[in-house]
Design a protein with these regions (language model features):
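Compositionally biased, low-complexity flexible segments
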Residues: 1-15
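Internal, well-folded beta-alpha domain core
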Residues: 103-275
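Hydrophobic, proline/glycine-rich low-complexity stretches
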Residues: 17-88, 238-275
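Extended, compositionally biased
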Residues: 72-124
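Active-site-adjacent core segments of small-molecule enzymes
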Residues: 17, 27-32, 90-94, 98-100, ...
Length: 275
């Protein structure tokens, strides 16, 4: 199965209501608050499909709405290797902080206009990391048996969920990374230049900012896809068609800032809205 890397300069994101979303930038804004976590993301593949915004809306946390590019929202399947996760001011945690991971993610805007991702699942191969992340931020981490291999320029990811179910939440992705992607691809920036996540935790919608260097993106050819994760995340039928965008990156080193209530105003605005 082959697919392209995604369009160059599509239409700008459109929104039917709410505060105008912040501009999309390939470089990060200043990290608000103090840094709390640091981790490296390596050998990532980004598979993305168009989905109608009304399909995404019920899957997002309160106080957010679907982010839209070229008339639709998007869902991403992103397998990669987590490396040296740990506290921002200390070394990465040996063994525990390095493992394969696969995310299913959506694209959101909050009532302050901040763009982010929303994770439907984060499949990870380290049970203590899964349990800690669920307890600390109610992130939807799940324990999975996962492998990432690279042979003769072909990268293979395979994952099977272990806990909590369903056990048939599996995925297998095989790609061949291509040439470096030149700057200026509007869709690539929309899908990857995300400087926060939104999550629902302890009765609130949280905004968790992050920062890292610009993504070193490459084109990629999708050689094989057998996915059941998207359906398990409430998106049946999406993975039965080829993705609309396929990208690859050798990775970045990222730092997360302090989570805050998504209703809180951005610095300097003095404005908060209900969620």
């Amino acid at each position: 199965m082959a697919a392209s890397a995604g369009g160059r300069a599509g239409g700008s994101a459109g929104h039917s209501g709410g505060v105008q979303p912040e501009p999309i930038t390939a470089t990060p804004p200043p990290l608000p608050g103090r840094p709390v976590l640091r981790q490296s993301w390596r050998d990532l593949t980004f598979l993305h499909w168009r989905v109608e915004a009304d399909v995404v809306t019920p899957l997002l946390p309160a106080g957010t709405r679907p982010d839209v590019h070229d008339g639709t929202s998007w869902v991403g399947l992103v397998p990669f290797r987590m490396v040296d996760a740990g506290a921002a001011r200390g070394p990465g945690i040996p063994w525990l902080g390095s493992f394969p991971e696969t995310n299913v993610r959506l694209y959101s805007v909050d009532e302050q206009g901040r763009r982010a991702v929303v994770f439907r699942t984060l499949e990870a191969a380290r049970l203590p990391f899964v349990l800690g992340s669920r307890a600390a931020l109610a992130l939807p981490y799940t324990w999975a048996r996962m492998r990432v291999t690279e042979v003769d320029g072909v990268v293979t990811y395979s994952s099977r969920r272990r806990w909590p179910g369903p056990r048939d939440a599996t995925t297998r992705v095989v790609v061949r990374p291509g040439e470096p992607l030149a700057p200026g691809y509007a869709l690539a920036d929309f899908l990857t230049a995300r400087w926060a996540l939104h999550t629902r935790a302890f009765g609130r919608t949280l905004h968790l900012p992050n920062t890292h260097e610009p993504w070193p993106l490459r084109t990629a050819e999708l050689l094989e896809l057998d996915d059941h994760l998207l359906a398990a995340c409430g998106l049946p039928g999406v993975a039965t068609r080829p993705p609309d965008s396929v990208l690859f990156s050798r990775g970045v080193r990222t730092t997360f800032g302090t989570p805050a209530d998504a209703r809180a105003p951005r610095p300097g605005t003095g404005r908060a809205t209900g969620a």
